[in-house]
């Protein structure tokens, strides 16, 4: 079984982990609804993309829910 020959210092450990940081999520404000959304994605509120309706909302009835 492989065992380290010397103890890894805090500096070397932290330098190795320097690339593991999470990046910021890029969000924009939708021009039609004013809600936050991811760029180049369909708006979850009204189903539009690039000012075009691409997803229609499904109307739920009592029969479909039951």
Curated annotation (Swiss-Prot):
Keyword Ribosomal protein (UniProt): yes
Provide the taxonomic classification: Bacteria, Pseudomonadati, Pseudomonadota, Alphaproteobacteria, Rickettsiales
What InterPro entries would the database entry show? Answer: Ribosomal_bL32, Ribosomal_bL32_bact, Ribosomal_zn-bd
Name the record gives this protein: Large ribosomal subunit protein bL32
Q: List the disulfide bonds.
A: none
Instruction: Extract one GO cellular component term from the record.
Output: large ribosomal subunit
Species name for this entry?
Rickettsia akari (strain Hartford)
Which parts of the chain span the membrane according to its record?
A: none
Tell me yes or no: is Ribosomal protein among this UniProt entry's keywords: yes
- Keywords for this protein: Ribonucleoprotein, Ribosomal protein
Q: Which GO terms label this protein's molecular function in UniProt?
A: structural constituent of ribosome
Record-stated family: Belongs to the bacterial ribosomal protein bL32 family.
Q: In its UniProt record, which GO terms are filed under biological process?
A: translation
């Amino acid at each position: 079984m492989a065992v380290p020959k010397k103890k890894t210092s805090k500096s070397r450990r932290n330098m190795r982990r320097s690339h593991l940081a999470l990046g910021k999520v890029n969000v924009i404000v939708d021009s039609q609804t004013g809600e936050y959304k991811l760029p180049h994605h369909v708006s979850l509120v009204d189903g539009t993309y690039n000012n075009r309706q691409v997803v229609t909302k499904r109307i739920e009835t009592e029969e479909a829910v039951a």
